[in-house]
């Protein structure tokens, strides 16, 4: 999914990989000044875009800046590599709607590969991504100084990992969809104790 859907920088952290799909024939938007086309699988009313880079065959390509607008007001911005109209390669995404920032690898409009996501509330994730989700190895440090380091799946701790809470209590071992239970100790990260079946 491209980054320009309002609040998408945050939304994709909880959205599932099932959102990935081949673009439909009308999934493009054109820079009104140059006519250069950019992929747009989730069109929004009143949105527009500008592209500062090359445009072979009428499609955005190479390195440049994609600036998205909502009713002529700047919203999301991507600076980096584009291939076949998609964010592809290395790039930085920021938003005027929320103060989140992502810097890292992209594939077909998704955060995919290695990257750093800084949230407007002070939280920070650094690690692997798969189709917009924290998946693989990574470290999340929350603004309150709690942290999780280890394996992730679909933006939740999953596999081997270590969570340290604000009181320096450590939960090290095997996690499943954000749930931890070992030796009578229970913890939930990115979910709730109730959703884990612990209450």
What feature does the model see in each segment?
Residues 6-15:
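Bacterial N-terminal signal peptides
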Residues 1-5:
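Positively charged n-region of N-terminal signal peptides that target proteins for export
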Residues 18-199:
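Intrinsically disordered, low-complexity repeat tracts enriched in Gly/Pro/Ser/Thr and acidic residues
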């Amino acid at each position: 999914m491209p980054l320009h859907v309002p609040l998408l920088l945050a939304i994709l952290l909880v959205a599932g990989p099932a959102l990935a799909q081949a673009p439909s024939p009308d999934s493009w938007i054109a820079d009104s000044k140059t006519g250069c086309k950019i992929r747009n699988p989730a069109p929004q009313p009143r949105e527009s875009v500008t592209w500062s880079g090359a445009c072979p065959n009428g499609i955005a390509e190479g390195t440049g800046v994609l600036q998205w607008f909502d009713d002529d007001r700047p919203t999301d911005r991507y600076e980096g590599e584009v291939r076949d109209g998609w964010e592809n390669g290395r790039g930085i995404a920021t938003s005027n709607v929320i103060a989140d920032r992502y810097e890292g690898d992209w594939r077909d409009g998704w955060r995919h590969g290695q990257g750093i996501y800084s949230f407007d509330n002070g939280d920070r994730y650094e690690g692997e991504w798969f189709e917009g989700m924290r998946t693989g190895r990574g470290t999340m440090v929350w603004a309150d100084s709690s942290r999780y380091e280890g394996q992730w799946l679909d933006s939740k701790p999953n596999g081997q990992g270590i969570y340290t809470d604000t009181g320096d209590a450590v939960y090290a071992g095997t996690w499943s969809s954000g749930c931890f239970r070992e030796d009578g100790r229970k913890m939930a990260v990115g979910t709730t104790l109730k959703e884990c079946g612990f209450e």
